[in-house]
């Protein structure tokens, strides 16, 4: 259940359901036919992470901790986003919560560091997650596409 705590804010965010339409004028994408798609495209991230991002943009001084689904209808999904005030004394003095006051945790939601954001990054253990070995898709790609010519080879 809900419990009011000092330094914590709950935002209820409404996100429109469905896929993402490519924002092009009159459907003119230009280029090869393989990239002509406009309508049946799917966004790479979840609607929950979109909700977190919007809450984080709206409340720039707060830090996004996490979020959860609260309901949906035919048009919208509703999420509640937990935000923390990093300058509230109750947060700064509590050893369990003062980690989020550090500058490195600014805008976690924009960088895919929340639970919902991490799910779309392909991180994990085992043979199903080989494309993110090294921490990210980019790190794995860079390592596999870099030619190392050692002095003694």
Swiss-Prot record:
Q: Which SMART domains match?
A: Ribosomal_L15e (SM01384)
Placement of covalent cross-link Glycyl lysine isopeptide (Lys-Gly) (interchain with G-Cter in SUMO2): 32
Q: Name one GO molecular function term.
A: structural constituent of ribosome
Principal subcellular localisation of the protein = cytoplasm
Positions of post-translational Phosphoserine modification: 46, 49
The domain of life is Eukaryota
Q: Provide the Gene Ontology terms for cellular component.
A: cytosolic large ribosomal subunit
InterPro entries linked:
Rbsml_eL15_core_dom_sf, Ribosomal_eL15, Ribosomal_uL23/eL15/eS24_sf
Biological processes annotated in GO = cytoplasmic translation
Region annotated Disordered sits at 114-135
What is its biological role? Component of the large ribosomal subunit. The ribosome is a large ribonucleoprotein complex responsible for the synthesis of proteins in the cell.
Q: How does this chain assemble?
A: Component of the large ribosomal subunit. Interacts with IFIT1 (via TPR repeats 1-4).
Q: What is this protein called?
A: Large ribosomal subunit protein eL15
Q: Which organism is it from?
A: Sus scrofa (Pig)
Q: What is the lineage of its organism?
A: Eukaryota, Metazoa, Chordata, Craniata, Vertebrata
Q: What gene name is given for the protein in this entry?
A: RPL15
